[in-house]
Structure formats: structure tokens, C-alpha cells
From Swiss-Prot:
The gene is hscA. One of its GO terms (molecular function) is ATP binding. InterPro entries: ATPase_NBD (IPR043129), Heat_shock_70_CS (IPR018181), HscA_NBD (IPR042039), HSP70_C_sf (IPR029048), HSP70_peptide-bd_sf (IPR029047), Hsp_70_fam (IPR013126), ISC_FeS_clus_asmbl_HscA (IPR010236). This is Chaperone protein HscA. GO terms for biological process: iron-sulfur cluster assembly. Belongs to the heat shock protein 70 family. It comes from Salmonella paratyphi A (strain AKU_12601). Chaperone involved in the maturation of iron-sulfur cluster-containing proteins. Has a low intrinsic ATPase activity which is markedly stimulated by HscB. Involved in the maturation of IscU. HAMAP family: HscA (MF_00679). Signal peptide: none annotated.
């Protein structure tokens, strides 16, 4: 159905033209780029078959290098070799210097206090450095896919704030990339394992990289990942494992001199090689600086046990912040190369009471999840799987009195979008309002899809129609709907989040649209009838209150006429004759006009009592 062939604005709408999209894991230590080919997500290697790209840029007057070549210059030209720039993203110079006092770069502050790094290529900010890394990844993807990228999904830590996320977007734009979306790294990892379409519940993402450890506790509900808590240790990672093992080898080899950088490098290289080998073997032989010996996995485990315990303490804190227990976690996803260490997997499994997910390469899992998301957003999914991600596929609205649906955001509205409407109370003294969020094209609640319900409480007890409640619908770029209801005079509010596309197939969307057309005339008549019945109920409710308060203003004959008109309205309101109800409402209005005028006069006299003409 052509209506459902929705693409990202600015992209070709050719139904059979596959668009080129990529997922980018812009990491602190290493970065990757991935794509979906023949239905499979895979990371893209360089000419030498290396999938990881070190997140390092070396700047010179005549240009710059990125990746392995740049990393090789780190020791000789420290000031011009920028690494771990992700730590600086979105931070002020003062913040960076307080957090990382030993960085070897020459910093200068810009007029707004943001950091500038003084290099041989001039003053550069973290956005520019990140852009150079992104350009290198994009070039790898374009060459591998034989074409320019139509869009990318870039992953960011779940704890990144708005400034850090905006900095990442700015870097992508500077690199000439169209950002389809920023995706939280733990969410990307969960998507890679297909958990977004699995059982609802709590998911833990344990991310142990080279230099940092992050733990994220997510809740999957109706297709939406909610970040419940994040934690970790920014100064703990696989590099610490390497240094502990290198120091152990030094002791075994009897090397006392720590000033020889060549020996230091040799020891560290030997430690890294041994660590990797011990993931599969129980024993590994080491030959370094003229010393030969054996290291067992048990010895290595003893060295790193305290560090692994530190990660589990961070996990416990994150679970406490999230308000859940380890046994509440459905799945544990392992991310980061250091999670290959058997002791890490063993201890994590013991802590959560379940075997962690490790089938996907932990170095690649985040990039793979981003690639899957990018493939969906760019419009490459077949018709049977495609959902409308860039427009509202079905109207969103609220249930109002009489079982009617008041549409707030119409179908085919481009997202992100926000719309608001004002509503009021139906009864005198009403202090709460039930908000029922609906989806669909029909006029009555019974014919639409219920999305969510919540209540707004604390409304001041005013006469019917006296309180004003603003209901705001906001749909973000991910298709996530937030509905907020706020009483204007007090500011009390309540809200809920839901993903309208969750559980919907294209055929269901098409069927709902078709039904709205087929039953259009019938629905309009049903709405008109319901509206008249609601108005009749409102008139009778208001009249009952007025008679209770001021019946003394009427003669017996006048009261009888009003009672007869009200009884007639009450009777016809039970039927299905719209015109009869409308005429009965008009008759009640006619019979009560004099009564209303007397009530108004009485109210004015009461208001003026005790005041002189001059005061008025």
C-alpha cells in the first residue's frame, strides 16, 4: 500500500531502491561501523581486515591521520595525538581539567568556556576531533558499500546529557553525515540480541571496555526501552587487567628498572597477548626481556579478582537505584572486549543468577544493534515488517464524555511533533479527571485502540467548566508518545509514556484506515448523537443544581413548566433521534431563561450588598 511506504524526509522514495545506512559505535578507545547486508548485520573491516578503529587522531601541519597510524604516534608526539576525545564531549574546559588533570594536551578556553586543543594543525575542539573519526568510519562504509551513506545511527552512553548528545550530532554534521538517530549504547546492545521484540521485563547491560566500566539497567515495556539506572567506574577497564598482569610478569622476570620505555612496552604487549590467550587456554608461555615462564588462568584470576568485584559493587548500586533485585533481571547482555575474560563472565553469571548473553562479539554488539536500527529507519525493511516511523500512522487522541474520541494529533503528521488542547470539568466540584489515550480514525472509543490510561488528581473543586486542563501530546523521533495533563491554575500534572506503534502491523493499520472510510457516514451520525446526549446530560446536571439552590425564585407554575421540559429532555435523551434531543434542549433553555435572569440579578445584589454606588 503506497500510503505506508514512508521514508526519511529527503530520501528517495523509490520502493525497490535499497538505501545505504550504517550504525556507528563511537567509542572512547575504539570505534566501529556496521551495516545490514542480505538481512545480516555485520561490522565493516579496513583493508587489512581490522574491524576496530582506534579512536585516536594525530594532527600535523600538513594534515591528520586516524586510527592505528595515529595511535602509533602517541608516544613520540603526545601533544598532537588526541585520544579518548569522547570524555571531553559536551564538557567545559574547567570540568575536563578537574576530571582528567593528567591529560597531556595544551588546552585553551574559548569565549564560552569550552575547550580548545592547541595542536600543530591549529586550535581544535572535541567536536572537530570526533568529526574526523566519524569521517574515517564513513569513508570505510562508503567504500565497502560502493556508495554514499543515506543516514547513520550513532550510539552514545545512556548517561550522556543533552550537551554531550548535541556535541555528537554536531560532529556528525561536520563529518557530512545525516543522523537518523542517536541510540543509547545499552539499548543498541539489547537490539542486537533481538530483545526489543522479546519478553517484557528488566535487562542489564554490563559494558567493560578498555578504559571504562558501565552498567545500565533497562526496562522493556511495550517495545520501549526505559533506562532505569546507570552506573559504573570511569577509571576501571581491561587496561587495568593488562597493567596488573604486566607488573606480575615484571616481578617474575626480576626486572627492577621501570624507566626503560621499551621494556615497559614489551611487558605490556606480553601481558595483553597472555590475557587474550588465557580466555581459551588454562596456561600460556611468556617470553619477555630474556625471561621465559608460564602463567596460569588461576594466577591471572587472582590478579584481577578485586577489579571484577568492583564492577559487581557498581552493579549492585545500579540495581538499588533502579529498585530491582538481581533475580528480577531477565537477561544480561555483555558488551566490551574485556567481557571475554572467563572470570568476568563467571562472576557476572553468579551475581545475576543467569548465564549472560555472549553469542555476539562483545566488541561489535553495539555497532550491530545500531546498524539494525539504521536499516529500519532508512526504510529498508520489507513491507511486511515496516511500521510508520517518521509519521503518525494513526490519529492520537483522548476519550471525552459520551464515549467520543477527540483527536489531538491527526494521522500522517510528521514526527517529532507536539500538540496541546484544553479540556474542562463536567461536574461541579470535580477534583480528578481520568485521561484515556486513544489511537484510531473512528469517532467512538469502542471502535478505536486503547493505548493507556492515567488520572490527574488535585484539580481545585470549582463549578463545572471552571477548571482548565491542558493536555499535551508529544511524539519524539523514536515514535515515543508522552501525554501530560496539567491543571492551569495550580500547576498539578500527571503524565504517561507509550509507544503507539507497539504491536501494530501494517495490515492492522491499513484495516483501521479502511474501516474509518467505510463507516465514515455512520460514525458521523453516531458522534452527533453522542454529542447531543452529552449536552443533554450537562444541561440537566446544571439545571438540577440551580433548582436545588434557588427554587424559591420560581412560582409553582413556572417550576412545573421547567420540570416538564426537563422530564421531556431526559426521556428523549434515551433515544436515538438527534433532532428531538436538540429541540428538547432548546425548549429547556427557553423555559429557564427567566429563571436564569433572576438568578443573575440575585447574584449581583449579593455582590453589591454593603457597598456604596461610589465604590462600584
Amino acid at each position: 500500500m503506497a500510503l505506508l511506504q514512508i521514508s526519511e524526509p529527503g530520501l528517495s522514495a523509490a520502493p525497490h531502491q535499497r538505501r545505504l545506512a550504517a550504525g556507528i559505535d563511537l567509542g572512547t578507545t575504539n570505534s566501529l561501523v556496521a551495516t545490514v547486508r542480505s538481512g545480516q548485520a555485520e561490522t565493516l573491516p579496513d583493508h587489512e581486515g581490522r574491524h576496530l578503529l582506534p579512536s585516536v587522531v594525530h594532527y600535523q601541519q600538513q594534515g591528520h591521520t586516524v586510527g592505528y597510524a595515529a595511535r602509533d604516534n602517541a608516544a613520540q608526539d603526545t601533544a598532537n595525538t588526541i585520544s579518548s576525545v569522547k570524555r571531553m564531549m559536551g564538557r567545559s574546559l574547567a570540568d575536563i581539567q578537574a576530571r582528567y588533570p593528567h591529560l597531556p594536551y595544551r588546552f585553551k578556553a574559548s569565549v564560552n568556556g569550552l575547550p580548545m586543543i592547541d595542536t600543530a594543525a591549529g586550535l581544535l575542539n572535541p567536536v572537530r576531533v570526533s568529526a574526523d573519526i566519524l569521517k574515517a568510519l564513513a569513508a570505510r562504509a562508503s567504500e565497502s558499500l560502493s556508495g554514499e551513506l543515506d543516514g547513520v545511527v550513532i550510539t552514545v552512553p545512556a548517561y550522556f546529557d543533552d550537551a554531550q548528545r548535541q556535541g555528537t550530532k554536531d560532529a556528525a554534521r561536520l563529518a557530512g553525515l545525516h543522523v537518523l538517530r542517536l541510540l543509547n549504547e545499552p539499548t543498541a546492545a539489547a537490539i542486537a540480541y533481538g530483545l526489543d521484540s522479546g519478553k517484557e521485563g528488566v535487562i542489564a547491560v554490563y559494558d567493560l571496555g578498555g578504559g571504562t566500566f558501565d552498567i545500565s539497567i533497562l526496562r522493556l515495556s511495550r517495545g520501549v526501552f526505559e533506562v532505569l539506572a546507570t552506573g559504573g567506574d570511569s577509571a576501571l577497564g581491561g587496561d587495568d587487567f593488562d597493567h596488573l598482569l604486566a607488573d606480575y610478569i615484571r616481578e617474575q622476570a626480576g626486572i627492577a628498572d621501570r624507566s626503560d620505555n621499551r621494556v615497559q612496552r614489551e611487558l605490556l604487549d606480553a601481558a595483553i597477548t597472555a590475557k587474550i590467550a588465557l580466555s581459551d587456554a588454562d596456561t600460556v608461555r611468556v617470553n619477555v626481556a630474556g625471561w621465559q615462564g608460564e602463567i596460569t588462568r588461576e594466577q591471572f584470576n587472582d590478579l584481577i579478582s578485586a577489579l571484577v568485584k568492583r564492577t559487581l559493587l557498581a552493579c549492585r548500586r545500579a540495581l538499588k537505584d533502579a529498585g530491582v533485585e538481581p533475580q528480577d533481571v531477565l537477561e544480561v547482555v555483555m558488551v566490551g572486549g574485556s567481557t571475554r575474560v572467563p572470570l568476568v563472565r563467571e562472576r557476572v553469571g553468579e551475581f545475576f543468577g543467569r548465564t549472560p548473553l555472549t553469542a555476539i562479539d562483545p566488541d561489535k554488539v553495539v555497532a550491530i544493534g545500531a546498524a539494525i536500527q539504521a536499516d529500519i529507519l532508512v526504510g529498508n525493511k520489507p513491507d511486511s515488517e515496516m511500521l510508520l516511523l517518521d509519521v503518525i500512522p494513526l490519529s492520537l487522541g483522548l476519550e471525552t464524555m459520551g464515549g467520543l474520541v477527540e483527536k489531538v494529533i491527526p494521522r500522517n503528521t510528521t514526527i517529532p511533533v507536539a500538540r496541546a488542547q484544553d479540556f474542562t470539568t463536567f461536574k461541579d466540584g470535580q477534583t480528578a479527571m481520568s485521561i484515556h489515550v486513544m489511537q484510531g480514525e473512528r469517532e467512538l472509543v469502542q471502535d478505536c485502540r486503547s493505548l493507556a490510561r492515567f488520572a490527574l488528581r488535585g484539580i481545585p473543586p470549582l463549578p463545572a467548566g471552571g477548571a482548565h486542563i491542558r493536555v499535551t501530546f508529544q511524539v519524539d523521533a523514536d515514535g515515543l508518545l508522552s501525554v501530560t495533563a496539567m491543571e492551569k491554575s495550580t500547576g498539578v500534572e500527571a503524565s504517561i509514556q507509550v509507544k503507539p506503534s507497539y504491536g501494530l502491523t501494517d495490515s492492522e493499520i491499513a484495516s483501521m484506515i479502511k474501516d474509518s472510510m467505510s463507516f465514515a457516514e455512520q460514525d458521523v451520525k453516531a458522534r452527533m448523537l453522542a454529542e447531543q446526549k452529552v449536552e443533554a446530560a450537562r444541561v440537566l446536571e446544571s439545571l438540577t443544581g440551580a433548582l436545588t439552590a434557588d427554587a424559591a425564585l420560581l412560582s409553582a407554575a413556572e417550576r412545573q413548566c421547567i420540570d416538564d421540559a426537563a422530564a421531556h429532555l431526559s426521556a428523549v435523551a434515551q433515544g436515538d433521534d438527534v433532532d428531538a434531543i436538540e429541540q428538547a434542549i432548546k425548549n429547556v433553555d427557553k423555559q429557564t431563561q427567566e429563571f436564569a435572569a433572576r438568578r443573575m440579578d440575585q447574584s449581583v445584589r449579593r455582590a453589591l450588598k454593603g457597598h456604596s454606588v461610589d465604590e462600584v
